């Protein structure tokens, strides 16, 4: 199976069902009154965190995510059924962006639910619209429009420990020994083509280790697996830097790989590292280890031989110890663009601007909501919309801008109106 960690999807929540205009018609009930039911709510779309998911394959090949519309209301005060919501399981570490590359949400915990798009509210039938002043309304509301937009999703794997190193240093073998992960293992470069997650158990505690594909020089430029997998390192609490003691210069390999991390994101070097000096059963490895320990001060260096299971228990306890010391070392959305609204930033009810065609264009969140639930084929509903505009001051502002004298037309959403006093 391919490892997919990015996807772009078109999202469309369901529209609300329309309310209905209906009147009770029964024998011996001369004043039956309105009995039109409300429309059902449109389906919403949610992402839910699932720890067993490990990539975005479902989202990659399901380009369009569309929820159903709510049912229309019926007579005899019968309400339309709400549409079913859509719940999509995504792996932990999934980040959601809008097309402006602003982060709009992320999934970090198993079972965590994130609202992606809200369904439209159901329109009210004339039974619900009856008031003391208007006990027999001859209109009903249309259902609200469900949210619709494109999103980009990106997966940055959540793991306590990230295994890094050049190809064929033994990362996949290590994770298969110390955890329940079973990656494919062979003695040639780029064996690991996708990250593997394994659960490691130490006494009564456990933690997650990620086997990340091997890096090569200029990985930050996209060479080899490149940036595609460097980003997954950002979410690991600590790093296990594995080097091959059978190579001629293990120290140079360590320095080169750290340079790749630095160029990609200098904050990666701030993460705690354990250096595993692997293949200590090779002739000459002990001499190289002594040189390594002289050059790298204040570093946790653990010599191992996966062939002989040397020091693996010590390694597991050391990883657990460092994880506990670095509980807060999990970067979330460092470059997020969440918008914070204050009382000073409160938006006006509407704005009016003149476009190139000479139309007075009226915009406002409240106006748009009222517009989309109004049935303009119904005279009474249209009249109610006009009263609403007058009540919030649109008519007065239009007169100030000269619409009465210039006889310009007014545009609200996708509809053009004439100004009549």
UniProtKB/Swiss-Prot annotation:
GO function terms (MF aspect): GTP binding; GTPase activity; magnesium ion binding
Obg domain segment(s): 1-158
Ligand binding (GTP): 165-172, 190-194, 211-214, 278-281, 305-307
InterPro entries the record matches: G_OBG (IPR031167), GTP-bd (IPR006073), GTP-bd_Obg/CgtA (IPR014100), GTP-bd_prot_GTP1/OBG_C_sf (IPR036346), GTP1-OBG_CS (IPR006074), GTP1_OBG_dom (IPR006169), GTP1_OBG_dom_sf (IPR036726), OBG_GTPase (IPR045086)
Chain segments annotated as transmembrane: none
Enzyme Commission numbers on file: 3.6.5.-
GO aspect biological process, one term: ribosome biogenesis
Gene Ontology, cellular component aspect: cytoplasm
Domain OCT: 342-421
Residues where Mg(2+) binds: 172, 192
Cofactors, names only: Mg(2+)
Its job: An essential GTPase which binds GTP, GDP and possibly (p)ppGpp with moderate affinity, with high nucleotide exchange rates and a fairly low GTP hydrolysis rate. Plays a role in control of the cell cycle, stress response, ribosome biogenesis and in those bacteria that undergo differentiation, in morphogenesis control.
Subunit text: Monomer.
Protein name (Swiss-Prot/TrEMBL): GTPase Obg
Organism: Phytoplasma mali (strain AT)
């Amino acid at each position: 199976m391919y490892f997919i960690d990015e996807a772009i999807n078109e999202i469309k929540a369901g529209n609300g069902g329309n309310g209905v205009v209906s009147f009770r018609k029964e024998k011996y009930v001369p004043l039956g009154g309105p009995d039109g039911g409300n429309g059902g709510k449109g389906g919403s779309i949610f992402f839910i965190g699932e720890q067993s998911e490990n990539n975005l394959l479902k989202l990659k090949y399901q380009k369009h995510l569309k929820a159903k519309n709510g049912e229309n209301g019926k007579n005899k005060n019968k309400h339309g059924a709400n549409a079913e919501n859509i719940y999509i399981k995504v792996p932990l570490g999934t980040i959601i962006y809008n097309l402006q590359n602003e982060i709009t949400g992320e999934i970090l915990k198993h079972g965590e639910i994130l609202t992606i798009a809200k369904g439209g509210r159901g329109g009210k039938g004339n039974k619900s619209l009856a008031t003391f002043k208007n006990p027999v309304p001859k209109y009903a509301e249309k259902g609200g429009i469900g949210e619709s937009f494109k999103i980009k999703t990106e997966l940055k794997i959540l793991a306590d420990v990230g295994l890094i190193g050049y190809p064929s240093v033994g990362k996949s073998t290590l994770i298969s020994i110390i955890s329940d992960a079973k990656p494919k293992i062979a003695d040639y470069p780029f064996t690991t083509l996708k990250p593997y997650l394994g659960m490691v158990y130490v006494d009564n505690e456990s933690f997650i280790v990620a086997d990340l594909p091997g890096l090569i020089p200029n990985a930050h430029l996209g060479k080899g697996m490149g940036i595609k997998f460097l980003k997954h390192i950002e979410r690991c609490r600590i790093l296990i830097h594995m080097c091959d003691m059978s190579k001629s210069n293990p120290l140079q390999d360590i320095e080169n790989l750290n340079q790749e991390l630095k160029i990609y994101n200098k904050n990666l070097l701030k993460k705690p590292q354990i250096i595993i000096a692997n293949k200590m059963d090779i002739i000459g490895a002990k001499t190289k280890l002594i040189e390594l320990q002289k050059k790298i001060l204040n570093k946790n260096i653990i010599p191992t031989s996966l062939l002989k299971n040397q020091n693996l228990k010590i390694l597991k306890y050391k990883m657990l110890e460092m994880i506990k010391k670095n509980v807060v070392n999990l970067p979330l959305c460092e470059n997020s663009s969440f918008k914070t609204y204050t009382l000073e930033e409160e938006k006006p009810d509407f704005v009016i601007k003149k476009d190139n065609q000479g139309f007075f264009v009226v915009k406002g969140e409240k106006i748009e909501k009222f517009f989309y639930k109004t049935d303009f084929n119904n005279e009474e509903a249209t009249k109610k919309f006009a009263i609403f505009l007058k009540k919030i001051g649109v008519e007065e502002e239009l007169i100030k801008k000269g619409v009465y004298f210039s006889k310009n037309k007014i545009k609200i959403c996708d509809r053009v109106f004439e100004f009549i006093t």
